[in-house]
Amino acid sequence: MGAPSPDQDIAAIRRNYQRASLRSVDLEADPVEQFRRWLQQAIAADLQESTAMVLSTFDGKRPSSRTVLLKAFDKRGFVFFTNYGSRKAEDISAHPNVSLLFPWYDLERQVAIMGPAERISRAESQAYFSSRPFGSRLGVWVSQQSQVISSRQILEMKWQEMNRRFANGEVPLPEFWGGFRVAPTEFEFWQGRENRLNDRFRYRPQQDSNHAQTWRIERLAP
């Protein structure tokens, strides 16, 4: 018999999830606070890129996904930054509903967040842009994100040009760059469990008897 095919090798790859459990009594009533707790645990575990999230958008015909970095969050939503001429920004302009996925594999857990995205204020974008290192601010001016280029040399030449242009270290925030905030309408917290009997809890908004917004929590079958 010959060696197993690559597909057979892949099919045999599996692990049994046993690190933790997630019970309804463990959950915060507010999903933002539940997310905060899990994010703090991911950071404390020294996970690589613990603030990385997979952003999925839709252009009207097909979805697309990419990894971006979470830069702020509160009860209003979850913030990331990008070029406003990028594919993701164009998708959001036409179809604002997106999803975010935080895949914390080493903790055998993930968080999915769904909701519409919209641009944040220029003042908020300016505050974050000013906090970035010089090279990161310069890079924003260098790259026309998602545009076809003939070679890497184009980027390197543009870098030198921008480096000369902003040699004094003062790099302004360009009009074509800034943040988006995703306002959550649904959360799902997933914790891997033994024998694939994983724990899943979904949060959806509801109104209480005083017409204040609260969150309905439901356990989902794995």
From Swiss-Prot:
Residues engaged in binding FMN: 66-71, 81-82, 87-88, 110, 145-146, 190, 200
Signal peptide: none
Biological-process GO terms, alphabetical: pyridoxine biosynthetic process
EC class: oxidoreductase
Record's keyword annotation contains Phosphoprotein: no
PANTHER family: PYRIDOXINE-5'-PHOSPHATE OXIDASE (PTHR10851:SF0), PYRIDOXINE-5-PHOSPHATE OXIDASE (PTHR10851)
Needed cofactors: FMN
Cofactor binding, note field: Binds 1 FMN per subunit.
Name of the protein described by the UniProt record: Pyridoxine/pyridoxamine 5'-phosphate oxidase
Keyword Oxidoreductase: yes
UniProt entry keywords in alphabetical sequence: Flavoprotein, FMN, Oxidoreductase, Pyridoxine biosynthesis
InterPro entries, alphabetized: Pyridox_Oxase (IPR000659), Pyridox_Oxase_CS (IPR019740), Pyridox_Oxase_N (IPR011576), Pyridoxamine_oxidase_dimer_C (IPR019576), Split_barrel_FMN-bd (IPR012349)
Functional summary from the UniProt entry: Catalyzes the oxidation of either pyridoxine 5'-phosphate (PNP) or pyridoxamine 5'-phosphate (PMP) into pyridoxal 5'-phosphate (PLP).
UniProt-annotated binding residues for substrate: R14, R15, N16, Y17, K71, Y128, R132, S136, R196, L197, N198
Alphabetical list of SUPFAM superfamilies matching this protein: FMN-binding split barrel (SSF50475)
The species this protein was found in: Prochlorococcus marinus (strain MIT 9313)
EC number: 1.4.3.5
UniProt record similarity statement: Belongs to the pyridoxamine 5'-phosphate oxidase family.
GO molecular-function term, one example from the UniProt record: pyridoxamine phosphate oxidase activity
Subunit structure: Homodimer.
Catalyses which reaction(s): pyridoxamine 5'-phosphate + O2 + H2O = pyridoxal 5'-phosphate + H2O2 + NH4(+); pyridoxine 5'-phosphate + O2 = pyridoxal 5'-phosphate + H2O2
Pathway info: Cofactor metabolism; pyridoxal 5'-phosphate salvage; pyridoxal 5'-phosphate from pyridoxamine 5'-phosphate: step 1/1; Cofactor metabolism; pyridoxal 5'-phosphate salvage; pyridoxal 5'-phosphate from pyridoxine 5'-phosphate: step 1/1
